[in-house]
A protein has these predicted regions:
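Short aromatic-glycine-(Arg/Gly/Cys) micro-motifs in beta-strand/loop hairpins
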Residues: 8-21
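A short, exposed loop/beta-hairpin motif centered on an aromatic-Gly-Thr core
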Residues: 24-33
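Short, charged, surface-exposed hinge/linker loops at domain edges
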Residues: 1-6, 34, 38-74
Length: 74
């Protein structure tokens, strides 16, 4: 299974802002497009880690079934 997410970059007076359309909270900025791209990769990882931590806290002690999902890089 492949899941494709969309990165959006916009030129602003300070450089670039970027976000992922399908992943709320994954947004960043950079002085250059390359910096914004790199920062967005880090932001994606941080959002996923934070969501995992929140989920683990919410289901702690609950009877749940966890199944892994593998997303292929585009």
């Amino acid at each position: 299974m492949n899941v494709k997410l969309t990165k959006v970059f916009q030129r602003v007076p300070e450089g670039y802002i970027g976000f992922v359309e399908e992943l709320p909270g994954a947004n960043t900025q950079g002085a250059t497009l390359e910096e914004a791209r790199s920062n967005l990769e880090e932001a994606i990882q941080l959002v996923l880690e934070a969501n995992r931590a929140l989920s683990e806290e919410l289901i702690q002690g609950q009877d749940v079934i966890r199944e892994p999902v593998l997303l292929s890089a585009a």
